[in-house]
């Protein structure tokens, strides 16, 4: 069922991948991603753990109404989260690449 390496080989691969995934998650948490809204007038930078690091608001928006600025900040934050999640998927795909899984089995389980 598991081929030449047997179950022991699969378990060893899984352990190695778990170690690589943990290391990758630690690296991802340190990376920063910036989301934008209003054609770059509002920028929100978050880390890989989705913690907000910085918010930049173009001074020209300070004269506009408060509700619009709040909406732009929320949109920029959501854009940053989306970008962070895409980055995480790409990084984690590199960790699982090359691992031989039984047919139909996918990571994460």
Curated annotation (Swiss-Prot):
It is found in: Cytoplasm, Nucleoid. One of its GO terms (molecular function) is DNA binding. Gene3D superfamilies: Nucleoid-associated protein YbaB-like domain. SUPFAM superfamilies: YbaB-like. Keywords: Cytoplasm, DNA-binding. Its main location: cytoplasm. It holds the Pfam family YbaB_DNA_bd. Residues 1-21 are annotated as: Disordered. Binds to DNA and alters its conformation. May be involved in regulation of gene expression, nucleoid organization and DNA protection. HAMAP family: DNA_YbaB_EbfC (MF_00274). This is Nucleoid-associated protein APL_0075. The lineage of its organism: Bacteria, Pseudomonadati, Pseudomonadota, Gammaproteobacteria, Pasteurellales.
């Amino acid at each position: 069922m598991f081929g030449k390496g047997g179950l022991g080989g699969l378990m060893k691969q899984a352990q190695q991948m778990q170690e690589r995934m943990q290391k990758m998650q630690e690296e991802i948490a340190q990376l920063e991603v910036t989301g934008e809204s209003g054609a770059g007038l509002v920028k929100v930078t978050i880390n890989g753990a989705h913690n907000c690091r910085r918010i930049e608001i173009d001074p020209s928006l300070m004269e506009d109404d408060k509700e619009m600025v709040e909406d732009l900040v929320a949109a920029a934050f959501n854009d940053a989260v989306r970008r962070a999640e895409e980055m995480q998927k790409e990084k984690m795909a590199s960790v699982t690449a090359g691992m031989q899984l039984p047919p139909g089995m996918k990571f994460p389980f």
